[in-house]
């Protein structure tokens, strides 16, 4: 396929905007984009309980427009590069999959649950809760874009003065400001816990729909087998899954017909005034615990993917690409989508298939049409979401592998340590979800079994992560423990009773205060899981950075990261939490399940920061012991650093040669 407007190369040849092999890239990237759109529709409904008017009227139109804009930009960038390299391949672009999960589980769902428990489970309360969740999600998306933009501008400045600084000094400064290893290592924990595990559970729960598509992807991803006619593995997996579901009678024509009610053009609207006008200082700080690391993820991911393209011979301006991506992410947030965009992994794959300039623009255009017309709802009832789960399982596994690959081999323990806070957060999410369900809060009335189908099946799938911003219970710090629920040890220590009233996170936390070990669930301290879950992304980054510096015997670097961890804990971005106290069915106040960040130490700046949502009806844990712990870390490492600098520290010999140490990438 050739274009009417070819791009000219220096040799007089022309680089067509579209070639026949662009179809391979189009179907492959298009399948990925379709999966993400289906996930947005399914998870927004099942996890955050957003109504259709928000999903199909605000979020998807903005997301589709962003995908189209990004792919058009990268197609134009490829046209420019084609003037010197005719076989150039455009960078693939789409919604950040990990960012999607982070926003859903760690910004929007916690905000929804907290507001619902504060406002009450009424029609008005639910609407206020979903609006608050959507608003905070969009704010977080814009915040991540701002972090990415500032980071890219800073790196551009460093690149500009590189000649004056010298290559080594510039490289060292960049690694100090942007430690890629620890950032990617923390991403690995999210990928394995909240992405891979979520979908693995569903794959094994629906083997008759998901296993054959899983086998297709195993063959294409791991064995690198080329399918007949060059069919992308993702596309074949979706087709096979749909065939199996329809063949088993799990999909229905009536559901497809009913979904046509959502079809119709939706014009994206500018929501800047609504989103930014509703911002309170505490909202910004609560979201910062997520959007700061999310912005760093996007920054590092975009840089690495653009650099990977350069290794394949397609050299795109790194700073320019990252800056444009940050602007598109900010735009999509202000247009109503909480989900950031990014350059996708896979440029080398599409280049190997022979795709060139036009494949991304075609895929982006189709995704935009589906999103802007509400057609995603129809497709969600034609293709079972379970058929797409193997794709997401591989995404999670690939990102985790990339996290370990971002470190030298000797830093493997540092990468492993970074997984711990994320796995603790995953465990807390399961505990919290169970308690909310047994209390009749998430699923107030049991539903009759429904067939596995499209977008609604996504909702029935995993009951993913609850998240950051979790309140605490009395007895954790500022207030004495005066539980309304069992004041004795009875019923708090052993099997949690399943009742309509349930037992709450607050009660389990207080039980731990009454008797060490009394607040355990399956052997795990709920308070400990909660402490690790608060700001776990920062905790993962700091653990990895500290460990990597210690492996390299860079004690002063480890001390620096320990001090930074103490500072963020003092602010309230890590470990500190508040559990709200809510009114039970009998009208009495009781320990709740709604947890939130608390910035009690910043009350001198703004009194509202010291009081979490719910006012005084909350118990606050300031994490002061953890601040002291990080300071002790810093003191120990500082002393060792001084001793080593003075040559008074005896070091054990390692098996790593000096040449390897000097050649390997250092964290700081």
Provide a role label for each language-model segment.
Residues 13-17, 49-54, 69-88, 283-357, ...:
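Membrane-embedded helical hairpins/re-entrant loop segments and their flanking transmembrane helices
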Residues 12-218, 347-377, 381-392, 397-407, ...:
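Early transmembrane hairpin of solute transport permeases
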Residues 427-532, 575-621:
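Low-complexity, proline/glycine-enriched hydrophobic segments characteristic of transmembrane helices
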Residues 1-95, 108-112, 570-626, 636-660, ...:
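N-terminal alpha-helical transmembrane segments of multi-pass membrane transport
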Residues 54-59, 216-304, 427-439, 450, ...:
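Flexible hinge motifs at transmembrane-helix junctions and intramembrane kinks/re-entrant loops
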Residues 137, 141, 201, 205-207, ...:
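Hydrophobic alpha-helical transmembrane segments
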Residues 76-85, 221-233, 352-358, 403-413, ...:
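Membrane-helix interface "capping/anchor" motifs
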Residues 64, 186-187, 210-215, 231-244, ...:
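Hydrophobic mid-bilayer segments of alpha-helices in multi-pass membrane transport proteins
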């Amino acid at each position: 396929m050739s274009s009417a407007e070819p791009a000219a190369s220096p040799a007089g040849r022309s680089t067509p905007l579209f070639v026949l092999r662009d179809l391979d890239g189009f179907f492959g990237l298009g399948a990925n984009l379709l999966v993400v759109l289906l996930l947005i529709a399914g998870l927004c409904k099942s996890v955050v309980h957003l109504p259709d008017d928000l999903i199909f009227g605000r979020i998807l139109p903005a997301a589709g427009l962003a995908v189209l804009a990004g792919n058009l930009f990268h197609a134009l960038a490829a046209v420019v590069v084609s003037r010197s390299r005719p076989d150039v391949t455009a960078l693939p672009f789409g919604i950040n999959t990990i960012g999607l999960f982070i926003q859903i589980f760690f910004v929007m769902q916690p905000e929804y649950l907290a507001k619902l428990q504060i406002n009450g489970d009424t029609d008005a309360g639910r609407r206020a809760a979903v609006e608050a969740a959507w608003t905070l999600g969009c704010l977080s998306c814009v915040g991540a874009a701002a972090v990415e933009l500032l980071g890219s501008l800073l790196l551009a400045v460093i690149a500009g003065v590189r000649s004056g600084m010298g290559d080594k000094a510039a490289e060292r400064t960049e690694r100090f400001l942007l430690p890629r290893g620890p950032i990617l290592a923390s991403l690995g924990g999210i990928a394995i816990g909240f992405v891979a595990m979520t979908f693995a559970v569903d794959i094994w729960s629906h083997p008759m729909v998901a296993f054959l598509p899983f086998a297709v992807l195993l063959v294409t991803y791991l064995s690198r087998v080329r399918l007949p006619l060059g069919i992308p593995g993702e596309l074949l997996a979706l087709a096979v899954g749909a065939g199996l579901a329809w063949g088993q009678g799990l999909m229905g024509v009536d559901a497809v017909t009913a979904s046509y009610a959502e079809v119709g053009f939706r014009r994206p609207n500018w929501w800047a005034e609504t989103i930014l006008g509703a911002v309170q200082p505490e909202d910004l700080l609560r979201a910062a615990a997520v959007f700061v690391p999310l912005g760093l993820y996007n920054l590092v991911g975009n840089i690495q993917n653009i650099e990977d393209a350069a290794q394949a011979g397609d050299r795109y301006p790194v700073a320019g690409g990252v800056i444009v991506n940050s602007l598109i992410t900010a735009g999509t947030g202000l247009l109503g989508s909480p989900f950031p965009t990014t350059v996708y992994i896979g440029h080398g794959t599409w280049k190997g298939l022979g795709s060139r300039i036009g494949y991304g623009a075609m895929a982006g255009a189709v995704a935009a049409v589906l999103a802007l017309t509400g057609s995603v709802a129809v497709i969600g009832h034609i293709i079972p979401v379970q058929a797409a789960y193997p794709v997401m399982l591989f995404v999670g596994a690939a990102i985790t592998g990339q996290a370990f690959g971002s470190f030298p081999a000797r830093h493997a323990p540092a990468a492993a340590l970074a997984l711990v806070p994320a796995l603790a957060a995953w465990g807390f999410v399961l505990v919290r979800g169970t308690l909310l369900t047994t209390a009749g809060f998430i699923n107030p009335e049991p539903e009759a079994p429904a067939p596995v189908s499209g977008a609604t099946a996504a909702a029935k799938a995993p009951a993913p992560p609850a998240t950051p911003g979790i309140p605490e219970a009395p007895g954790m710090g500022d207030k004495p423990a005066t539980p309304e629920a069992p004041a004795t040890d009875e019923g708090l220590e052993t099997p949690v009773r399943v009742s309509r009233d349930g037992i709450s996170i607050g009660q389990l936390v207080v039980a731990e205060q009454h008797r060490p070990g009394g607040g355990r669930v399956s052997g795990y301290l709920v308070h400990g899981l909660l402490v690790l879950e608060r700001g776990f992304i920062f905790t993962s980054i700091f653990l990895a950075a500290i460990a990597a510096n210690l492996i390299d015997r860079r004690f002063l670097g480890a001390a620096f990261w320990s001090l930074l961890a103490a500072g963020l804990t003092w602010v309230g971005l890590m470990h500190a939490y508040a559990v709200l106290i809510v009114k039970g069915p009998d009208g009495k106040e009781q320990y709740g399940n709604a947890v939130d960040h608390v910035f009690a130490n910043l009350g001198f700046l703004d009194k509202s920061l010291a009081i979490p949502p719910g006012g005084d009806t909350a118990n606050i844990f300031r994490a002061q012991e953890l601040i002291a712990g990080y300071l002790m870390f810093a003191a120990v490492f500082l002393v060792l650093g001084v001793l080593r600098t003075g040559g008074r520290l005896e070091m054990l010999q390692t098996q790593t040669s000096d040449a390897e140490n000097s050649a390997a990438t250092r964290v700081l």
